[in-house]
Amino acid sequence: MKNYALIGDIHSIYSRLSQALTYCEHQDLIPIFLGDIFDSRCSVSDSVGVYNLIRDAEKKLNAVVLQSNHQNKFIRYLKGHKISANHGLDVTIEEFKNSSIDMNELLEWLDNRPYGAVFKDKDDLEYRCAHAYFSSRIEVPNYEEIHLIHSNQLNKKIKNVMIYGPVNNEGRIEWWKTNKKHHYKMVSGHYHKLIIEDHCLILDGECGDEGDHVFLALYDVNKKLLKKFF
């Protein structure tokens, strides 16, 4: 059986990503990136380096990269839509403009990443992964090894919930506090939190923010082991 590593928000921090991928290679893990791979909000940023590392991990380690809110905004920029280039996106744009990366190829790659991933661990526990929230409205068929959920399987409302998370009139819904009665484990990044419980994993060590407390989170699924890369 294949073993997976769930990797939280990266936000253009090359050194931590490199450490995480070295761990995956040594432990024979398939990385599943939970999104927000670009847009650093600190003084360190290498969006192009992160992109190249991830593309290499796709080839060598069969890595999976999920859609997210930050990537969605970059996609809209690359398609020519008017957006506010803030929260680190301005840095990402500038770094790619000053690189040799083909922007059309970059757009095609970003636009074709799946919104969700479903797989089982060695104990037959199912993991349902999305950047912010795996909608219960998604029907998961029988599958072998891993099932990916792509854009053409979803309507706009569900896509938005998967990359931004559910909201109500009072704001963001903290779904992990109430949504505990299901036979699978929900996995996300996005929330600037680290939560490891029987019913959910939230893996966002605030990588890309300033401070000594921030880290890139990796969860080795079969070992049930959290790794922090500083």
Language-model features: locations:
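His/acidic metal-ligating clusters that form di-metal
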Residues: 102-194
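Active-site neighborhood of divalent metal-dependent phosphoester bond hydrolases
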Residues: 40-128, 151-156
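A general structural motif
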Residues: 1, 26-30, 60-62, 124-126, ...
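Active-site neighborhood of phospho(di)ester-bond hydrolases with catalytic His/Asp-centered motifs
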Residues: 7-8, 31-35, 64-69, 130, ...
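Conserved beta-sheet core of the metallophosphoesterase superfamily
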Residues: 165-229
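A short acidic (Asp/Glu
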Residues: 17-18, 42-46, 75-78, 132, ...
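Short, solvent-exposed loop/turn segments at secondary-structure junctions
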Residues: 12, 38-39, 71-72, 133-137, ...
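N-terminal active-site segment of His-dependent metallophosphoesterases
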Residues: 1-51
